[in-house]
Design a protein with these regions (language model features):
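Catalytic micro-motifs at enzyme active sites that drive phosphoryl/nucleotidyl and oxygen chemistry
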Residues: 18-24, 33-34, 201-203
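Interdomain/boundary linker segments immediately adjacent to catalytic/signaling cores
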Residues: 94-182
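Glycine- and charge-enriched low-complexity intrinsically disordered segments
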Residues: 66-116
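Charged, structured surface patches that assemble and position nucleic-acid processing machinery
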Residues: 1-11, 26-44, 48-76, 271-318
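Catalytic core segments in nucleotide and nucleic-acid processing enzymes
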Residues: 189, 199-318
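Polyanion-binding interface signature
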Residues: 1-24, 217-218, 222, 232, ...
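Short, glycine/acidic-rich beta->alpha junctions
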Residues: 25, 141, 145, 155, ...
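Acidic-basic catalytic patches of nuclease active cores, encompassing PD-(D/E)XK
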Residues: 161-209
Length: 318
């Protein structure tokens, strides 16, 4: 049953599953539930488990489901709360005249500029909140530009054959997949720079691979006199139920790794695996309540991670 809690919570809830409902168990934490209406009272439900399946669906529909649920119609989110008028206006002013997609860096920088103009205290926000606001606003920017550019590309067009149609569709899907990861990387890099933390994005470490970030940089990594506990090898994963293991083979000089993620919860068993592998999870504070309650104290938020890094680097130079 779907129930509207308007007075207190201002949200819908799915209720009355019963104690023997097969999906009410800890192993399903972080999965994606998709409901497709057949009629007003009859829905088809899909539960997606693997990262690849979740990202494939989101890319195909042109949606992103981090932080909250959403209702989508014709690929456009129908939000319960109205969009901020200032953000909406600046999005249109920034990209209304674009005939093609700008670079990922331009998207990210523009999103932050919009927030700086529309939110009086944006520069004072904690890193966790600044990260989530920036990612959400950039997603709005991307949606607007995609409609402007791709609508002209496909609306009313007669494709000469199936291959041309598939090629066009794949181009749109691949752009959506790549954009989310680049957005995440760009905003994390900005936060590190703002915090004054030296770092290198995607350094080439030879046989030790190419991690997403190394702190303070390659020179310190290859300097065997530099203390290992003052080195940080970081993986950036928008989803990490499976992909967190990739960081284990990167920057192998550093045994204790960090993974920064937007993953909305994973199981206690997976968190035990991470702990055994000496991988610390860094999750924006607003997403901590998506994780098993007994594991939440073990999670780092972005602010805590930045503080920890700065303290360790400061002791290395003293």
């Amino acid at each position: 049953m779907v129930t509207w809690y308007g007075a207190a919570k201002h949200e819908y809830r799915l209720t009355r599953f019963g104690h023997d409902f097969p999906f009410l168990n800890a192993d399903m934490v972080g999965d994606l539930l998709v409901l497709i209406p057949k009629s007003l009272n009859d829905f088809i439900a899909y539960v997606l488990d693997y990262d690849e399946d979740i990202e494939e669906l989101q890319s195909a529909l042109g949606v992103e489901s981090f932080q909250n649920w959403g209702v989508y119609q014709n690929g456009v989110a129908r939000k319960v709360e109205s969009e901020d008028e200032c953000v909406d206006r600046l999005i249109r002013e920034s990209f209304g005249a674009f005939g093609d997609f700008p670079s990922g860096e331009v998207f990210s920088e523009t999103a932050r500029q919009v927030l700086q103009k529309c939110l009086r205290n944006f520069s004072e926000l904690p890193p966790d909140e600044a990260l989530m606001r920036s990612i959400e606003t950039e997603y709005q920017l991307f949606q607007f530009v995609e409609r402007v550019v791709c609508q002209n590309l496909v609306a009313g067009r007669l494709f000469k054959d199936i291959d041309e149609f598939i090629q066009t569709a794949l181009s749109i899907l691949n752009r959506r997949k790549a954009r989310a990861g680049r957005s995440f990387e760009n905003h994390i890099e900005y936060l590190l720079t703002q915090a004054g933390i030296p770092h290198k994005m995607r350094p080439a470490l030879g046989a030790d691979g190419r991690p997403d970030i190394i702190i303070p940089g390659e020179k310190a990594y290859f300097d065997l006199s530099w203390p290992e506990d003052k080195l940080f090898v970081i993986g950036l994963k928008t989803t990490c139920k499976d992909r967190w293991r990739q960081v284990l083979n990167e920057g192998r000089r550093v045994q204790a790794k960090h993974v920064v993620t937007l993953q909305q919860g994973i199981t206690g068993n997976q968190l035990k695996e991470m702990q055994a592998a000496r991988v610390s999870l860094v999750v924006p504070r607003s997403l901590h309540n998506k994780y098993p309650e007994d594991w939440q104290p073990a999670l780092l938020d972005v602010q805590g991670f930045i503080t920890n890094v700065k303290q360790r680097l400061a002791s290395a130079t003293n």
